[in-house]
Amino acid sequence: MPICIPDELPAVNFLQNENVFVMTSTRANIQNIRPLKVLLLNLMPKKIETENQFLRLLSNTPLQVDIQLLRIDNRKCRNTPAEHLNNFYCDFEQIKHQNFDGLIVTGAPLGLVEFEDVAYWKQIERIISWAKEHVTSTLFICWAVQAALNILYGLPKFTREVKLSGVYYHSTLNPLALLTRGFDESFFAPHSRYADFPEQVVREHTDLDILSSSEDAGVYLLASKDKRMVFVTGHPEYDAGTLASEYLRDLAAGLAPKIPINYFPDNNPERKPLASWRSHGHLLFSNWLNYYVYQITPYDLTYMNPTLD
């Protein structure tokens, strides 16, 4: 959250030059505060586990956030009780006339499935199109990034021959970017995907800012210049044991997966992994909520005209 100081205080310019968010008294006196409405479109099979992961990150901020869980359709889910879905999730038809401050679209285990073969592809297209008019800022995770880049920018699907799995070093590329404010110059983040995001293709075919990348994992963090769209190609929400669970699952299925990179101590799957990305994940979501949602969303959501002014 910002600090509030007098407009004329010399520290205003000093702190702003250091990329510290300062709110002058003039702006603070006219600022209205209300809970933020955030929609979570959960595409993951283990929905309760995914809810817990994202809600943990969304809760680490002074802002009050009202969460609405959204499912893509009413088909049965093998990994989540129907009672849970019926009690806590809404369908798109129930909320399509509402506006929201934020939307999060989770990943999905669809890395080897062509877009046209995704059972709910039409629904994904519809929701992403709807979000442009009804949501201040949308955050896409992993597979959802690939889907959104195709829908919004026409980028084709790029697939790795070998699944990218592990915890990788990343670098921040713009020291003044609001989304990475407070980040270490290098940090860890987990990846678990077949999707590939060639940096040259992103630069040539979109106007997105690349805010963070990894020498081994590639592009990690992208954002539109108006802050309406954010793309995270990894999984900062993952628990310490999520990659281990995926590795053991694939091993049991006979897929001969590689041991996740830089994850198990001494590269030994028998040893308990530790989360080295937790602080980064919390800061990423805190920055998104503050700078990309709260600071630009209209007080009255009836009028969806997010602005930096």
Swiss-Prot record:
Site entry: Important for acyl-CoA specificity: G111
Site (Important for substrate specificity): S192
Domain of life: Bacteria
UniProt-listed InterPro entries: Class_I_gatase-like, HST_MetA, MetA_family
Active-site residues per Swiss-Prot or TrEMBL entry: C142, H235, E237
Keywords recorded for this protein, A-Z: Acyltransferase, Amino-acid biosynthesis, Cytoplasm, Methionine biosynthesis, Transferase
Alphabetical list of Pfam families matching this protein: HTS
Sites where the protein binds substrate: K163, S192, R249
Any single GO CC term annotated in Swiss-Prot or TrEMBL for this entry: cytoplasm
Gene Ontology molecular function terms on file: homoserine O-acetyltransferase activity; homoserine O-succinyltransferase activity
Family annotation (Gene3D superfamilies): 3.40.50.880
GO biological process, one term: L-methionine biosynthetic process from homoserine via O-succinyl-L-homoserine and cystathionine
PANTHER family reported for this sequence: HOMOSERINE O-SUCCINYLTRANSFERASE
Summary of the function given for this chain in its UniProt record: Transfers a succinyl group from succinyl-CoA to L-homoserine, forming succinyl-L-homoserine.
Entry's family note: Belongs to the MetA family.
HAMAP family (UniProt xref): MetA_acyltransf
UniProt-recorded name of the protein: Homoserine O-succinyltransferase
Provenance organism: Photorhabdus laumondii subsp. laumondii (strain DSM 15139 / CIP 105565 / TT01)
Encoding gene (name): metAS
